[in-house]
């Protein structure tokens, strides 16, 4: 029974160990021997099992390698940085040992697994260290050997502390900042890597001899912290003394050199004075003078270049060539053909090296019409010019290709503004009469024509007897002023012919002189056109009172009879300028009674008054007294 039973067990086991027993027919050993032999077999089969794992499963090495890499990648990596200490390294070593336990692999693959579990400085050092090992030698490196290599280098962040120690050796202590750096780095090394005494000796070697003697002679037992404190106090004392020395030097330099400072202030003041003087001169030059051979082009924004216009040129002679300017002004009017010749004037001005500048046009109308320009009288005033120089002004009309139509020139001499007699001007007017008539008949009659100014110099040959000239101007002064003043004309008065303004130069000049005194512009000749100045003819005149002061507490009925409320004036689009207050009326309009100083009522104003009194039931509480007076009347 025992034999049959042993045979069945051996057959069921199917092992090669019992095959010999079955074949030879031998019996099994006793029970005690069985247990002993079984233990021996297990001890003997462990390396065999390991060998079978490594050898028989070589086909599955790639799959196992990927699994190992995945496990290591999820592991917390060791970097050996400043915050990593010995405990962190031990924890990392235990974790990677658990992952790689039972793996029968060596060499390059194991090196790759360990490198994937490192980062930072630890990974850099491990890769650089194992890179130089031969492939045949690295096959003998097991996991324990790689781990010992890492522990030797990174146990307690040994390499990091070594780097800090090298920095301490090269550090020089010469300021408070370097002293703080030494204290910080030595504090990281003293407990584990560097002793307190060694750190103190290293610190003393870096100080100056004076500080070394001061620390050696100290009465207290010297430690690293005490040495750092004494050195910091010494550096702070030196810094304060240096600041005081610099401040003292600056004060001494300021006290010793007061003259240079004052001279600098004086030079600044002189520079500011010269700059202010130059600015004043520049402003006056902009008004009166211009550089030689320089032409001031008018602003294109203020006039259209494509439309015909008139330019006013101001030619100034800085070199005071009086004879040259007089000859030029005389030749401008005494041409061979009897016309004003601008080309000769241009050539003469260029030969005399005079100065030209274009003044912007004063007014520009629609295209195809005449353009007027009036000479600014401020250029002749003594306060504006400030110097006694002769100027030659001429105006030029640009009308397409032809420049000869309506060309007028005038020569002006300062302090010699005298009107020309009518007989001399009539000669010029007769020559230009045909051209002016043709222009007026051609449909340009509703445009403005500027009043001509002619101021010849005293030495000119065209000047006639001044006594006769003054008589003519005085005789025609009052009559022509009443005709030319638009604020004193009546509707029934006849319109003036525009050509008549060319036949009375003295009168036109006197009118413009009076308007200049009043602060007005020069009055054009054809200002009486219905389409332009309709409201100026119908405006009523009244004494120039200050109604705001006079009627502040008065009733409406106490105001002057010729006072017109702004609500009663219809179609009064033009407002009288403030300069009208200085005008003294020479003649009165027919609408104002000279004796009673009251304006005659018109149908239009009566209708307006009746319309304004239609609603008696509406009572204004502020006008109770006024309404009572009206009811009593």
Swiss-Prot record:
Region (Disordered): 12-43, 593-612
Keyword set includes Protein biosynthesis: no
Chief place of localization: membrane
Subcellular location: Membrane
Gene Ontology CC: cytoplasm; membrane; nucleus
Keyword Transmembrane helix: yes
Mode of membrane association: Multi-pass membrane protein
Annotated Polar residues bias: 13-29
Superkingdom of this protein's organism: Eukaryota
TM regions (residue ranges): 99-118, 217-233
Keywords for the protein's UniProt record, in alphabetical order: Membrane, Transmembrane, Transmembrane helix
Extent of Basic residues compositional bias: 31-42
Other facts: Present with 105 molecules/cell in log phase SD medium.
The protein, known as: Uncharacterized protein YIL092W
């Amino acid at each position: 029974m025992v034999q049959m039973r042993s045979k069945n067990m051996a057959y069921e086991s199917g092992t090669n160990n019992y095959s010999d027993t079955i074949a030879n027919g031998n019996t099994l050993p006793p029970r005690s021997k069985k247990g002993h032999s079984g233990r021996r077999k297990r001890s003997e089969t462990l390396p065999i099992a390991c060998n079978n794992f490594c050898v028989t499963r070589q086909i599955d090495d790639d799959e196992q390698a990927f699994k190992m890499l995945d496990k290591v990648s999820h592991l917390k990596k060791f970097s050996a940085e400043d915050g990593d200490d010995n405990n962190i390294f031990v924890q990392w070593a235990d974790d990677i040992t658990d992952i790689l336990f039972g793996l029968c692999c060596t060499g390059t693959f194991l090196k790759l697994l360990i490198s994937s579990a490192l980062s930072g400085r630890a990974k850099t050092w491990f890769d650089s260290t194992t890179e130089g090992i031969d492939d045949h030698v690295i096959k003998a490196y097991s996991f324990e050997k790689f781990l010992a290599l890492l522990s030797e280098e990174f146990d307690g962040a040994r390499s990091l502390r070594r780097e800090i120690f090298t920095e301490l050796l090269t550090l020089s202590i010469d300021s408070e900042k370097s002293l703080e750096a030494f204290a910080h780095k030595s504090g990281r090394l003293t407990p584990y890597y560097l002793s307190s005494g060694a750190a103190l000796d290293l610190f003393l070697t870096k100080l100056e001899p004076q500080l070394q003697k001061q620390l050696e002679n100290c009465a207290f037992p010297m430690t690293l912290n005490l040495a750092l404190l004494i050195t910091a106090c010494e550096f702070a004392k030196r810094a304060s003394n240096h600041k005081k020395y610099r401040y003292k030097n600056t004060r001494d330099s300021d006290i010793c050199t007061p003259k240079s400072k004052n001279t600098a202030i004086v030079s600044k003041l002189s520079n500011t004075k010269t700059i202010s003087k130059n600015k004043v001169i520049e402003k006056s030059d902009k008004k009166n003078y211009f550089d030689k051979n320089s032409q001031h082009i008018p602003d294109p924004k203020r006039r259209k270049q494509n439309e015909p216009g008139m330019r006013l040129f101001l030619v100034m002679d800085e070199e005071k060539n009086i004879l040259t300017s007089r000859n030029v002004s005389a030749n401008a009017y005494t041409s061979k053909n009897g016309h004003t010749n601008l080309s000769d004037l241009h050539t003469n001005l260029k030969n005399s090296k005079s100065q030209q500048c274009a003044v912007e046009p004063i007014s520009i109308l629609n295209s195809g019409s005449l353009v007027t320009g009036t000479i600014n009288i401020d250029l002749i005033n003594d306060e504006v010019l400030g110097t006694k120089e002769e100027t030659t002004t001429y105006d030029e009309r640009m009308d397409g290709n032809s420049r000869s139509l309506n060309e007028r020139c005038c020569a002006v001499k300062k302090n010699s503004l005298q009107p020309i007699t009518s007989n001399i001007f009539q000669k010029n007017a007769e020559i230009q009469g045909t051209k002016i008539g043709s222009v007026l008949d051609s449909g340009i009659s509703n445009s403005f024509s500027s009043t001509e100014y002619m101021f010849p110099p005293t030495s000119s040959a065209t000047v006639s007897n001044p006594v006769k000239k003054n008589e003519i101007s005085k005789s025609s002064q009052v009559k022509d002023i009443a005709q030319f003043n638009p604020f004193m004309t009546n509707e029934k008065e006849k319109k003036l012919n525009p050509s008549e303004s060319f036949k009375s130069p003295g009168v036109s000049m006197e009118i413009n002189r009076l308007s200049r005194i009043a602060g007005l512009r020069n009055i054009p000749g054809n200002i009486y056109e219905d389409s332009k100045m309709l409201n100026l003819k119908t405006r009523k005149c009244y004494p120039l009172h200050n109604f705001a002061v006079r009627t502040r507490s008065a009733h409406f009925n106490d105001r002057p009879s010729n006072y017109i409320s702004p609500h009663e004036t219809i179609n009064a689009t033009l407002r009288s300028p403030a300069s009208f207050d200085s005008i003294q009326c020479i003649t009165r309009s027919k609408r104002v009674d000279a004796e009673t100083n009251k304006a005659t009522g018109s149908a239009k104003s009566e209708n307006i008054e009746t319309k304004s009194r239609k609603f008696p039931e509406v009572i204004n509480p502020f006008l109770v007294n006024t309404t009572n007076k009206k009811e009593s009347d």
